[in-house]
Amino acid sequence: MQPPHPSESARAFFAFHLKRHREGKGWSQPALGAKIHISGSMVSGIELCTRRPTLKVCQKLDEVFGLSQFFEALYPRVVEETGLPAGFPEFADAEAAAGMMKLYESFVITGIFQTEDYARAVLRAGQQPDKLERLVAARMERQEILRREVPPVVTALLDASVLRRRFGGREVMRAELEHLLTLAEWPHIHIHVVPEDAELCPEGSFTILSSMGEPDAAYAEMAGGRGRLIDDDGYIAELGVLFELIRSKALNAEDSQAAIRKALEEL
């Protein structure tokens, strides 16, 4: 696979200069990865434009190559091209480093659990085809954290209505629910369905991230799909209390899987 020409996009420009600097040092992709604490495969992905660098990676690259904020200055342009909402790229960076994730989703199956077809259906409204595919690719890229050697522990609370709210038609929804059942078997993923008659009315969906040695972060999505990154300790603590309240109303793991299977049968 050949990377795109550096004139095509900020990401391609970034990739071209990353490879140029790496080869100038005589370093292999794994060797560079070891120096900046990422895998050689991620270095390869960045150079092929299939992976987006995080802000921390940009800063580390400048450090090891002895550059004055060259890659860091490119980061906002790379993020801008993804079409992600304000605050979300920073959240995605924090998500990639998280050791634990707690999330509540009230409208759709959460992004890191979505199949490509389901994600495309969810994101399609009002998007130009090229931007849509960038958004889908970014969402699929985020899911790689679930498959890494030491994945985060994820506890997901899904409102029961998301199991019946169809995106993309019957077959797309069927594949999505089957995928959800597969994920529920993974030891680091805990999925709980919140019954529709639970006496709760949270304002919107949210995710809380925890990392060893780092302060917690959160992302809250409100009506209309607008979201914001949260680093206020008090607000994050309130979300933690809300998460536990919702979890107290949710089904256990076994009953949650039964609810997903029932939704499958009713398609």
Residue ranges and their predicted role:
Residues 1-2, 11-14, 28-33, 80-82, ...:
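Short hydrophobic/aromatic-rich motifs at helix boundaries and adjacent loops
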Residues 34-36, 91, 258-261:
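Short secondary-structure junction/hinge motifs that connect adjacent elements
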